[in-house]
UniProtKB/Swiss-Prot annotation:
Usually encoded in the trnK tRNA gene intron. Probably assists in splicing its own and other chloroplast group II introns. The keyword Iron does not apply. This is Maturase K. GO terms for molecular function: RNA binding. One of its GO terms (cellular component) is chloroplast. Keywords: Chloroplast, mRNA processing, Plastid, RNA-binding, tRNA processing. It comes from Saxifraga oppositifolia (Purple mountain saxifrage). GO terms for biological process: mRNA processing; tRNA processing. It comes from the Eukaryota. The keyword Plastid applies.
Length: 352
């Protein structure tokens, strides 16, 4: 990993995240094959013990250097063996190597974002949007509506490439990714998975590549929620340090509303609802909020327009179901959650 960091620590005018040259290094495929380095990835590399070797990697690299093996003619497509090995094994090795390479700048990007947060200051109660238990432990009495959102899916494989293009400036790697996607053509089945489909697809080959692409796609999809949840988190906390932190936070939010109302009047309504909760589970996400029905509808169409215009992801308003917590319950982690109302009895007495 130290060698990878030295590779990316270049001058600013040279730092373009060129990943394609790394594909021709043998240690990339050694990392993809090593079970020890992948102990934190809950996916097994099936079939690598009998298919990968240093000699096979050298032959693959030599073949890629001398000629382009990705451009297969009609006569070569009928051949099931190449250099004594199955051609599918080459594509599988390249995809696994690309996944290992793609995770390097993606992880460095997350580390840099964490370092920037530490420079700004510690924030104990602005927790991650993926925190399931704070979401379940929070008090929903002050919430009115819940939006059951199905994660939008890309209408074309090129959308997946465009999601990586925003932080990966290597055209050669993007072309290689396009080839791998069209080679297997099972991305659309993975992006909208059911539990049965997901288990059957992940257990097949190239699971590391598709899981990496799915996580990067969802990261782009949740970019708007990262901003909103970091600004308007209202998770329950009891520490005194957090209380002072929340006071300082509401002061900053008040100043932000005043500035935003002057410079950007149309988005003033965006900062009026501090009570927002977001969590993602499998292929859908849940957004709970407090506000009027008109405000919730604005949120709905704002998210749809944001995904379509800025992320080029096709989404329909019907994929966002808005229900009132007082009358409906929402399913999450196999449970149906609802809000129990405590009606107050008012007794009147006539005075003589």
């Amino acid at each position: 990993m130290g060698e990878f960091q030295r590779y990316f620590q270049l001058d600013k005018f040279l730092q373009q995240d060129f990943l394609y040259p790394l594909i021709f290094h043998e240690y990339i495929y050694a990392l993809a094959h090593d079970h020890v380095l992948n102990r934190f990835v809950f996916v097994d590399n099936f079939g690598y013990d009998n298919k990968s070797s240093s000699l096979m990697v050298k032959r693959l690299i030599t073949r890629m250097s001398q000629q382009n093996p990705l451009l297969i003619s009609a006569n070569d497509s009928n051949k099931k063996k190449x250099l004594g090995h199955n051609t599918n094994x080459y594509s599988q090795m390249i995809s696994e190597g690309f996944a290992v390479i793609g995770e390097i700048p993606f992880s460095l990007r997350l580390v840099s974002s964490v370092e920037r947060k530490e420079e700004i200051g510690k924030s104990h109660n602005l927790r991650s949007i993926h925190s399931l238990f704070p979401f379940l432990e929070d008090n929903f009495v002050h919430l009115n509506y819940v939006s059951d959102i199905q994660i939008p899916y890309p209408i074309h494989l090129e959308i997946v490439v465009q999601a990586l293009r925003s932080w990966l400036k290597d055209a050669s790697s993007l072309h290689l990714l396009r080839f791998l996607l069209y080679e297997y053509q099972n991305w659309n089945s993975l992006i909208t998975p059911t539990p049965k489909k997901l288990s059957s697809i992940v257990s097949k080959r190239n699971q590391r590549l598709f899981l990496f692409l799915y996580n990067s796609y969802v990261c782009e999809y949740e970019s708007i929620f990262v901003f909103l949840c970091n600004q308007f988190s209202h998770l329950r906390s009891t520490s005194s340090e957090t209380v002072f932190e929340r006071i300082f936070f509401y002061k900053k939010r008040k100043a932000l509303v005043e500035v935003g109302s002057k410079d950007f009047p149309p988005v003033r309504w965006l900062f009026k609802d501090p009570f927002m909760h977001y969590v993602r589970y499998q292929g859908k996400s849940i957004l709970a909020s407090k506000g009027t029905p008109l405000l919730i509808e604005k949120w709905k169409y704002y998210l749809v327009n944001f995904w379509q215009c800025h992320l080029y992801v096709w989404s329909k308003p019907v994929r966002i179901h808005i229900n009132q917590l007082a009358n409906h319950s929402f399913g999450f982690l196999g449970y149906l959650s609802s809000v129990r109302l405590n009606p107050s009895v008012v007794r009147s007495q006539m005075l003589e």
